[in-house]
Curated annotation (Swiss-Prot):
GO terms for molecular function: electron transfer activity; heme binding; iron ion binding. InterPro entries: Cyt-f_TM, Cyt_f, Cyt_f_lg_dom, Cyt_f_lg_dom_sf, Rudment_hybrid_motif. HAMAP family: Cytb6_f_cytF. Keywords: Chloroplast, Electron transport, Heme, Iron, Membrane, Metal-binding, Photosynthesis, Plastid, Signal, Thylakoid, Transmembrane, Transmembrane helix, Transport. One of its GO terms (biological process) is photosynthesis. It comes from Manihot esculenta. This is Cytochrome f. Belongs to the cytochrome f family.
Length: 320
């Protein structure tokens, strides 16, 4: 009898442990799946709108610079570097989800021409791998290999991101031609201000949802505030919830207006986008250009030699 009870107790404990582990896995997976750049991938078929605006700007409201460097021209079936720079002050700290301060992260989206894609590992040189570090790039969609995303990654280590790109070969891909192509890039540093569902993060300013008097301010145990605004004319009360992170700007008894900032804006990051151009160069055209330059140089040499020969003939005739 005692053995049966012990076995039953062990079985319950194992079942409970499995349930707890399963819940932790689900919560962790959900947290990861909602991280940048999954937000854009889940909500938009294409990260670049018809207006040219990259959709990351919908969540990262502050405008910051970003720079991209690519070769002026590349040959078919060649691996080259696309270097994206996301500059910011390394001394800055951002508000984390729990309201505490921490280092900024960065992320980027690179929109390449059709046919261009991430270079396979066996085509990447050791020098390029060293520049890439431990970054793991992914396609925006399985069917959109020309659109690459990365992030969030530590900004102090990866404010300069090197993408290894493989150029297409028009001989193998009939829809690719030897032309000049545009490349678009978007880069952010720090957390966003708006979530995809339209709700605010704690990395933005909070405004009053009503006009009136600040009748009560309650500081929550885990951080953040609960602000009660009383409309003296109607006697109506509105409660605004402020999450941990932003600093409070108002005090009890203060008269405020509708949409007046209740907090500071803690955001120190932002998003920027840029573009560049790259030429997919025809090797035959390059060979033709080299042949032409060689012909010009040879012609110049022959002209110089002919001129010297003519001068010698003239000199000999004058002496005669």
């Amino acid at each position: 009898m005692q053995t049966r009870k012990t076995f039953s107790w062990i079985k319950e404990e194992i079942t409970r442990s499995i349930s707890v582990l399963l819940m932790i896995y689900i919560i962790t997976w959900a947290s990861i799946s909602n991280a940048y750049p999954i937000f854009a991938q889940q909500g938009y078929e294409n990260p670049r709108e018809a207006t040219g605006r990259i959709v990351c700007a919908n969540c990262h409201l502050a405008n910051k610079p970003v720079d991209i460097e690519v070769p002026q021209a590349v040959l078919p079936d060649t691996v080259f570097e696309a270097v994206v720079r996301i500059p910011y002050d390394m001394q800055l700290k951002q508000v984390l989800a729990n309201g505490k301060k921490g280092a900024l992260n960065v992320g980027a989206v690179l929109i390449l021409p059709e046919g261009f894609e991430l270079a396979p590992p066996d085509r990447i040189s050791p020098e390029m791998k060293e520049k890439m570090g431990n970054l793991s790039f992914q396609s925006y969609r399985p069917t959109k290999k020309n659109i690459l995303v990365i992030g969030p990654v530590p900004g102090q280590k990866y404010s300069e991101i090197t993408f290894p790109i493989l150029s297409p070969d028009p001989a193998a891909k009939k829809d690719v031609h030897f032309l000049k192509y545009p490349i678009y890039v978007g880069g952010n540093r720090g957390r966003g201000q708006i979530y995809p569902d339209g709700s605010k993060s704690n990395n933005t300013v909070y405004n009053a949802t009503a006009a009136g008097i600040v009748s009560k301010i309650i500081r929550k145990e885990k951080g953040g505030y609960e602000i009660t605004i009383t409309d003296a004319s109607e006697g109506r009360q509105v409660i605004d919830i402020i999450p941990p992170g932003p600093e409070l700007l108002v005090s009890e008894g203060e008269s405020i207006k509708l949409d007046q900032p209740l907090t500071s804006n803690p955001n120190v990051g932002g998003f920027g986008q840029g573009d560049a151009e790259i030429v997919l160069q025809d090797p035959l055209r390059v060979q033709g250009l080299l042949f032409f330059l060689a012909s010009v140089i040879l012609a110049q040499i022959f002209l110089v030699l002919k001129k010297k020969q003519f001068e010698k003939v003239q000199l000999s005739e004058m002496n005669f």
